[in-house]
Each structure stands twice: as structure tokens, then as C-alpha cells.
């Protein structure tokens, strides 16, 4: 009797953390990006026995799951030969040339420069003149000393002009009081003359 035996084996990738340097993720701006290397191993019964293939290093962000390829600084091209450096400089000059739509720089004719020397700008030589109706406020000037007598006269005139309505009201009230007093005096005099006449009549009647 044959009994089938299943032996699990195969190739499987295994990730390895290279370092824990501080790197910032381009996607989520997180500072916990890890440098990881994913190698391929031979597994037997889910146990890694030997490495079959070296994998590439990449940057992995554990927060958002983004993977970015990583390039070592040593793999960057270095120009030790001066001819290579010259070739690189020529390529940069070709790339930075002006396009066909860029207008050329305007060249000033020599005749215009001669005329400009003969007739300089007159506005720069003329001094600035003060316009009429505007005061020149110079804060460095000394303070103006006021005349005390003129200031006192100004205050008196201002006080009189402000108190003219009150004075007019007072004059009107005094005139009204004088008129009332004159009327009362006239009434008293009339009463006195009336009673004096009655008294004279009574005396005359008694004598008779």
C-alpha cells in the first residue's frame, strides 16, 4: 500500500531591515520610513535553508505602505576624468540655450548714446520746487513762540463770541422785569390817587 507523502518546498521572499535612520515619507510625511532588502530564499517545510537571489533595497513606509526604490550614493556617476567633466559641461550649455521664441536683446545704436551725452536729462538737474497752496512740513524746525498778548486777545474774543447768545437772553429778561416793575408802579399810583380822592370827598361832606 502506497502512502503519498507531501513535502512542501519552494522559493520565498524574505525581507530584512537594513538600518533605522530617520527618513521622511514623500506620501504621508511620516518620519518612520525603513530601509528594507527583500531576498529570495529556498524553503523546505516552511524553513529557509539558503539564499538563492539577492534582492534590491527599497524604502518602505509602515504607516501608508508606500514603497520607494533606493539608490546608494556609491552607484551615482562620478567624473574622475577631466574629459568627462568637459563633456558634461557642454551638455549643460546645450540644454540651457535659449529657445526659438526668445527675443534677442535689443542693441542700442551708438548715435543714440552720443545724443544722450549731449542732452542730459533736465529733470534730474532741476531742483524740486514747492507747489503753491501746500505747506512744507519740516519737523526739524524750532517750535513757534506765540505772543502772549495776542493769545489773550484771541481767547477774550472767542469767549465773547461764545457767550453772546447768553448775554442777549439775560438782556431780554432784564427788560421784561423792568416793564413789569413799571406796570406795577403805575397801578399803585392809580390806586393811591383813587383813595385820596375818596378821602377828600368824605371830608368835604362832613364839613357841610
From Swiss-Prot:
Residues 118-208 are annotated as: Disordered. It comes from the Eukaryota. Residues 138-175 have a biased composition (Polar residues). InterPro entries: Zinc_ribbon_15. Pfam families: Zn_ribbon_15 (PF17032). Residues 118-134 have a biased composition (Low complexity). Residues 187-201 have a biased composition (Basic residues). This is Putative uncharacterized protein DDB_G0288303.
Amino acid at each position: 500500500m502506497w502512502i503519498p507523502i507531501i513535502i512542501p518546498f519552494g522559493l520565498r521572499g524574505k525581507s530584512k531591515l537594513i538600518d533605522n535612520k530617520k527618513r521622511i515619507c514623500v506620501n504621508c510625511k511620516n518620519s518612520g520610513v525603513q530601509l528594507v532588502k527583500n531576498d529570495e530564499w529556498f524553503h523546505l517545510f516552511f524553513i529557509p535553508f539558503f539564499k538563492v537571489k539577492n534582492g534590491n533595497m527599497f524604502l518602505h513606509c509602515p504607516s501608508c505602505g508606500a514603497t520607494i526604490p533606493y539608490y546608494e550614493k556609491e552607484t551615482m556617476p562620478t567624473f574622475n576624468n577631466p574629459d568627462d567633466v568637459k563633456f558634461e559641461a557642454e551638455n549643460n550649455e546645450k540644454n540651457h540655450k535659449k529657445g526659438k521664441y526668445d527675443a534677442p536683446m535689443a542693441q542700442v545704436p551708438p548715435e543714440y548714446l552720443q545724443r544722450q551725452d549731449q542732452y542730459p536729462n533736465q529733470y534730474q538737474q532741476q531742483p524740486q520746487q514747492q507747489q503753491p497752496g501746500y505747506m512744507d512740513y519740516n519737523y526739524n524746525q524750532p517750535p513757534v513762540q506765540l505772543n502772549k498778548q495776542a493769545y489773550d486777545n484771541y481767547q477774550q474774543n472767542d469767549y465773547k463770541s461764545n457767550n453772546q447768545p447768553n448775554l442777549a437772553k439775560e438782556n431780554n429778561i432784564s427788560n421784561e422785569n423792568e416793564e413789569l416793575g413799571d406796570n406795577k408802579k403805575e397801578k399803585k399810583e392809580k390806586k393811591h390817587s383813587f383813595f385820596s380822592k375818596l378821602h377828600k370827598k368824605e371830608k368835604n361832606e362832613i364839613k357841610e
